[in-house]
UniProtKB/Swiss-Prot annotation:
Name of this chain's protein: Norsolorinic acid reductase A
Induction: Natural plant compounds carvacrol (CR) and trans-cinnamaldehyde (TC) strongly reduce the expression.
Protein's organism: Aspergillus parasiticus (strain ATCC 56775 / NRRL 5862 / SRRC 143 / SU-1)
UniProt-recorded Gene Ontology molecular function terms: oxidoreductase activity
InterPro entries for this protein: AKR_Detox_Biosynth, NADP_OxRdtase_dom, NADP_OxRdtase_dom_sf
Length: 388
């Protein structure tokens, strides 16, 4: 018997990838961020009603996307409720790889008089948050549960044992961590492995061409720990615009700082050469810098989502990556600058021990290169047309 070959996906979003070396679940190369879905924060973030949110979810899903990110406190709970209603109406829960988060005070606008234990990393906060998330999402399991941030009061032992209890009982499949120092993540994973518990498989945090702190410790930590990366803020949070564009539209997003202005000009220049958008270059940039990178892409407009999906086909050369790096100098800090940098050599994330200048005194060393990211597919479909 000859087994059929899977049909060609409708867009590049449908070519799925392994989440991380420690999590074999298959996910779309972009993760749909949903923080704007809801009425709870419309006074601050602008309006994104349920119809618009469902349209975004439908477009993402119909384009082949299955990786959706929510959190317990987004929009006062509207986000989880709406995503839960959407999955129930579409009857596609098991097709979706759903991530949510606990730690933030998700009852801040609720009726409870005493709210101190509805936030934090501790066991009670975790139990209450996951129970509420499962109800709002209309599901009996969460694919990926993040510690949203480290509270610096709960012990590593309590966090990892409490999280593992949820995994052992089938309520959670994989664990992630967000907005937490690298040394704490390593400590958590070491404790988990030493005690037969589930370690973290994914890290979520702020990373873009203008905000490269991620590259100091988080990126090498994830490489060493076998963790995937789900960076947010990749598109510059509305700041990656040329001076001309920002003069027209920037009033809605606050002032543009000099760093984003310089990078916006560089990204815009490169985008014009490639007949694309500056934000598409920004997205391709992080996906070219390391393997297992799944940008969290949000927003309220379907046309922007389609641009993000089409950007999956963008190819950046090593020289173009270097140009973006050099547009805004980045100090990697000690000890990496001491080990790798010289008057003629700047630190790059793909460097290995052969690039340590102190070791070149006695020998010319050749080393195995670091693992490279998946190259963008060429010739796959976008929206009704073939890529070139």
């Amino acid at each position: 018997m000859v087994l059929p070959t899977a049909p060609e996906p409708p867009t590049l979003l449908g070519y799925h990838r392994i989440l991380s070396p420690s999590a074999g679940v298959r996910v779309s190369p972009l993760c749909l961020g949903t923080m704007s879905f809801g009425n709870g924060w419309k006074g601050v973030m602008g309006e994104c009603d349920q119809a618009t949110s469902f349209n975004m979810l439908d477009t993402f899903y119909e384009s082949g996307g299955n990786f959706i990110d929510v959190a317990n406190f987004y929009q006062g709970g509207d986000t989880e409720r709406w995503v839960g209603e959407w999955m129930a109406q579409r009857q596609n829960r098991d097709e979706i790889v759903l991530s949510t988060k606990y730690t933030m005070g998700y009852t801040m606008f609720g009726p409870q008089k005493i709210k101190s234990n509805f936030q934090g990393n501790h066991a009670k906060s975790l139990r209450l948050s996951v129970k509420a998330s499962l109800q709002k999402l209309q599901t009996d399991y969460i694919d990926l549960l993040y510690v949203h941030m480290w509270d610096f009061t709960t012990s590593v032992e309590e966090v990892m044992r409490s999280l593992n209890h949820l995994v052992a009982n089938g309520k959670v499949l994989y664990l992630g961590v967000s907005d937490t120092p690298a040394w704490l993540v390593v400590k958590c994973n070491a404790f988990a492995r030493a005690n037969g518990l589930t370690p973290f498989s994914v890290y979520q945090g702020h990373w873009s061409s203008a905000f490269r702190d991620f590259e100091r410790d988080i990126l090498p930590m994830c490489e060493s720990e076998g963790m995937g990366l789900a960076p947010w803020g990749v598109l510059g949070r509305g700041q990656f615009r040329s001076a001309e564009e920002f003069s027209r539209e920037g009033r809605k997003m606050g002032p543009q700082d000099e760093k984003h202005r310089r990078l916006g000009e560089k990204l815009d220049q490169m985008a014009q050469q490639k007949n694309t958008k500056a934000t598409s270059i920004a997205q391709a940039y992080v996906m070219h810098k390391a393997p297992y990178v799944f940008p969290v892409i949000g927003g309220r407009k379907v046309e922007h989502l389609k641009e993000n999906i089409e950007a999956l086909g963008l190819v950046l050369s090593e020289e173009e990556i270097r140009e973006i790096d050099d547009a805004e100098p980045f100090d990697v800090g000690f000890p990496m600058n001491f080990l790798f940098e010289t008057p003629t050599q700047s630190y790059r994330t793909n460097m290995t021990s052969k690039d340590i200048w102190q070791l070149s005194c006695n020998t010319r060393l050749e080393t195995v290169p670091k693992q490279q990211p998946i190259e963008p597919l060429q010739g796959a479909k976008y929206f009704g047309s073939a890529s070139k």
